[in-house]
Amino acid sequence: MRAIGVFEYITLRAVLACATALLIGLVAGPRVIRRLTEMKIGQAVRAYGPESHLVKTGTPTMGGALILIAIAISTLLWADWTNRFVWVVLLVTFGFGWIGWMDDYRKVVYRDPEGMPARQKFFWQATIGLVAAVYLAFAVSAPANTELWPLFKAWVGSGFTMPLPTRADLIVPFFKSVSYPLGVLGFVALTWAVIVGTSNAVNLTDGLDGLAIMPTVMVGSALGIFAYVVGRVDYSKYLLFPYIPGAAELMVLCAAIGGAGLAFLWFNAYPAQVFMGDVGALALGGALGTIAVIVRQEIVLFIMGGVFVVETLSVMVQVTWFKYTKRKYGQGRRIFRMAPLHHHFEVGGWKETQVVVRFWIITMMLVLVGLSTLKLR
């Protein structure tokens, strides 16, 4: 009985979840790649991308499905099935994975590098993000095992003015006990933006071999540490974080993300044998955003995921400036040689591996900055 009791420890189950996901990915990876190759599910490279990427045409894609399967099996093996946060993260992850799958399907079957129309993709992202945001507004606020429907009815009955408890506030890192109350609508709006924004940010970053997956592993692992802290009464009190009942269980899921991500990197490292595709990138981004919201570390996610943020901003700035100058001068002008930012450096002469490893180093430093907020307050 004592031997069985050790599995009650979240830290042990997190280690086992990581090892299980890693093993599943490494064992199943070659079979999945071989099957994708036989089915001719190859990458369609955009014509306006760097010329050096044309050699990637035909490389198996949609390998993100392997990541999701490894995460799901590992999480269901080692996590607490009664934990509402585990389920909401899994559902969001697979919801965004479904969007990515449909997008990749159009690219592969119809040989359309653009995939699903942008408006259609955003509609489904916005819908899933909104449902998750409304649910989390009450799930984060409520004590463990509390029914959420009565809370929702109470909020509606109050004329949509019912405040949320302080643990649902927006936490400002590096400052002791500084937070801002959001209210239900503010919480929903912020959560929606974080989930949808992170999903798209990871997807935009996934443009070079190994570029997106390693930062995802690092950020996800760090969020697992935050989940463990805020999910424990003693640690959260000592470190001045809000106590979120049940959040510690997300450490198991974060560990599964780390293990599955490392297994995928084995095959995605330059020169990549397989790409994760939108099915992986959108799903992993959605998972990171959802976990960050639950552990109340939205701003810290912004810091640790700085590479994702800068990649996204580079696209937004490039598109906005191009449209503005085209309207004003009759010819569009660019700020970057090419967007997203990793292509800017490629066109500037950096080797693909240089861009990837340097972005990894930057992410590692940013994650350390994020983790420092556990104590530097």
Curated annotation (Swiss-Prot):
<keyword id="KW-0808">Transferase</keyword>
<dbReference type="GO" id="GO:0046872">
    <property type="term" value="F:metal ion binding"/>
</dbReference>
<comment type="function">
    <text>Catalyzes the initial step of the lipid cycle reactions in the biosynthesis of the cell wall peptidoglycan: transfers peptidoglycan precursor phospho-MurNAc-pentapeptide from UDP-MurNAc-pentapeptide onto the lipid carrier undecaprenyl phosphate, yielding undecaprenyl-pyrophosphoryl-MurNAc-pentapeptide, known as lipid I.</text>
</comment>
<dbReference type="Pfam" id="PF00953">
    <property type="entry name" value="Glycos_transf_4"/>
</dbReference>
<dbReference type="GO" id="GO:0071555">
    <property type="term" value="P:cell wall organization"/>
</dbReference>
<dbReference type="GO" id="GO:0051992">
    <property type="term" value="F:UDP-N-acetylmuramoyl-L-alanyl-D-glutamyl-meso-2,6-diaminopimelyl-D-alanyl-D-alanine:undecaprenyl-phosphate transferase activity"/>
</dbReference>
<keyword id="KW-0131">Cell cycle</keyword>
<protein>
    <recommendedName>
        <fullName>Phospho-N-acetylmuramoyl-pentapeptide-transferase</fullName>
        <ecNumber>2.7.8.13</ecNumber>
    </recommendedName>
</protein>
<dbReference type="GO" id="GO:0008360">
    <property type="term" value="P:regulation of cell shape"/>
</dbReference>
<feature type="transmembrane region" description="Helical">
    <location>
        <begin position="210"/>
        <end position="230"/>
    </location>
</feature>
<keyword id="KW-0479">Metal-binding</keyword>
<keyword id="KW-0460">Magnesium</keyword>
<feature type="transmembrane region" description="Helical">
    <location>
        <begin position="299"/>
        <end position="319"/>
    </location>
</feature>
<feature type="transmembrane region" description="Helical">
    <location>
        <begin position="122"/>
        <end position="142"/>
    </location>
</feature>
<feature type="transmembrane region" description="Helical">
    <location>
        <begin position="247"/>
        <end position="267"/>
    </location>
</feature>
<dbReference type="InterPro" id="IPR000715">
    <property type="entry name" value="Glycosyl_transferase_4"/>
</dbReference>
<comment type="similarity">
    <text>Belongs to the glycosyltransferase 4 family. MraY subfamily.</text>
</comment>
<dbReference type="InterPro" id="IPR018480">
    <property type="entry name" value="PNAcMuramoyl-5peptid_Trfase_CS"/>
</dbReference>
<keyword id="KW-1133">Transmembrane helix</keyword>
<keyword id="KW-0997">Cell inner membrane</keyword>
<keyword id="KW-0573">Peptidoglycan synthesis</keyword>
<feature type="transmembrane region" description="Helical">
    <location>
        <begin position="59"/>
        <end position="79"/>
    </location>
</feature>
<comment type="pathway">
    <text>Cell wall biogenesis; peptidoglycan biosynthesis.</text>
</comment>
<feature type="transmembrane region" description="Helical">
    <location>
        <begin position="9"/>
        <end position="29"/>
    </location>
</feature>
<dbReference type="GO" id="GO:0005886">
    <property type="term" value="C:plasma membrane"/>
</dbReference>
<feature type="transmembrane region" description="Helical">
    <location>
        <begin position="274"/>
        <end position="294"/>
    </location>
</feature>
<keyword id="KW-0961">Cell wall biogenesis/degradation</keyword>
<feature type="transmembrane region" description="Helical">
    <location>
        <begin position="155"/>
        <end position="175"/>
    </location>
</feature>
<keyword id="KW-0132">Cell division</keyword>
<dbReference type="GO" id="GO:0009252">
    <property type="term" value="P:peptidoglycan biosynthetic process"/>
</dbReference>
<feature type="transmembrane region" description="Helical">
    <location>
        <begin position="85"/>
        <end position="105"/>
    </location>
</feature>
<keyword id="KW-0812">Transmembrane</keyword>
<keyword id="KW-0133">Cell shape</keyword>
<dbReference type="GO" id="GO:0008963">
    <property type="term" value="F:phospho-N-acetylmuramoyl-pentapeptide-transferase activity"/>
</dbReference>
<keyword id="KW-1003">Cell membrane</keyword>
<dbReference type="InterPro" id="IPR003524">
    <property type="entry name" value="PNAcMuramoyl-5peptid_Trfase"/>
</dbReference>
<feature type="transmembrane region" description="Helical">
    <location>
        <begin position="178"/>
        <end position="198"/>
    </location>
</feature>
<feature type="transmembrane region" description="Helical">
    <location>
        <begin position="354"/>
        <end position="374"/>
    </location>
</feature>
<dbReference type="GO" id="GO:0051301">
    <property type="term" value="P:cell division"/>
</dbReference>
<keyword id="KW-0472">Membrane</keyword>
